[in-house]
Design a protein with these regions (language model features):
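C-terminal juxtamembrane segment of a hydrophobic transmembrane alpha-helix
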Residues: 17-41
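Perimembrane helix-loop junctions in membrane proteins
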Residues: 36-39, 43, 59, 63
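Conserved G/P- and acidic residue-centered "switch" motifs that form tight phosphate/ATP-binding loops
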Residues: 15, 47
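Short, conserved structural patches
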Residues: 48-227
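Flexible, glycine- and charge-enriched loops at secondary-structure boundaries
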Residues: 7, 36, 128
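N-terminal hydrophobic or amphipathic segments with adjacent small-residue motifs
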Residues: 4-5, 23, 44
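N-terminal leader/signal peptides at the extreme start of proteins
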Residues: 1-9
């Protein structure tokens, strides 16, 4: 009986049953973490490229480069939109609030805030689609066009315009704009850890229709429009 109590022949199996699952979790967790970092970097880089392309493309908010001046403002042609001493708006140009728009994709087509027309027509070289396609080429570099299976889709993209306060009255091509390209409601799938741990992660609030998974932060890049 004493000999049986001192028998340690099965101790290796017990140690293995404790160490092996931990080893698998750490190993596969490292792989999942690396893939997550790749996704984060790719999404960030995609917004950089999207902003660069957006500032040299036709605007998605169609009329934003044709500000409406009053008769008295038109008489100030060539005058700056701001006071050179203080840097504040002097009333020579339309208010900055009227020259801003957030353009997103909706189920029935795109829409822009502030009353602007969402433009993604062939006549203007499909500005929204062109920006999206170039961003997909970065985020889903392992896929080929038309990027049907790319996690980055139209619903994730927002193109925003806002007046900078610079420029002068009746400036050709419109007043300078800060163009922001952002990604929202993106999710990341944990391929190994998610299955092993039976994680069920729902998209964050306000992201109806997004694929379930870990909610990535919002990515945004802003550049000033070119002449």
């Amino acid at each position: 009986m004493i000999k049986f109590w001192r028998d340690l022949a099965g101790s290796v199996l017990v140690e293995y049953s404790v160490v092996f699952p931990t080893f698998i979790l750490v190993t596969l967790g490292t792989v999942d973490l690396a893939l997550m970092l790749v996704d984060l970097a790719a999404a960030n880089k995609a917004t950089h490229l999207g902003a660069r392309y957006a500032i040299v493309s036709n605007p998605v908010a169609k009329e934003i480069t044709s500000p409406r001046y009053t008769v008295s403002q038109q008489q100030q042609i060539g005058q700056t939109c701001f006071d050179s001493a203080s840097g504040v708006a002097n009333g020579n140009c339309p208010p900055a609030g009227s020259l801003s728009a957030d353009c997103t994709w909706a189920a029935n087509g795109g829409r822009c805030t502030n009353g602007y027309t969402f433009d993604d027509t062939a006549a203007d070289s499909y500005p929204f689609t062109s920006i999206l396609t170039r961003m997909q080429a970065i985020y889903c570099a392992h896929l080929k066009p038309p990027y049907t299976h790319c996690p980055l889709q139209r619903e994730n993209l927002t193109v925003s315009y806002a007046a900078t306060g610079a420029g002068y009255v009746l400036r050709p091509g419109g007043l300078p704009l800060a163009v922001t390209v952002s990604l929202n409601c993106m999710t990341h799938q944990f391929y190994f850890i998610g299955a092993l741990m039976r994680w069920s992660l729902a998209p964050k609030e306000g992201c109806a229709g997004a694929v379930s998974g870990w909610s990535m932060p919002t990515f945004a890049s802003t550049l000033t429009s070119e002449d």
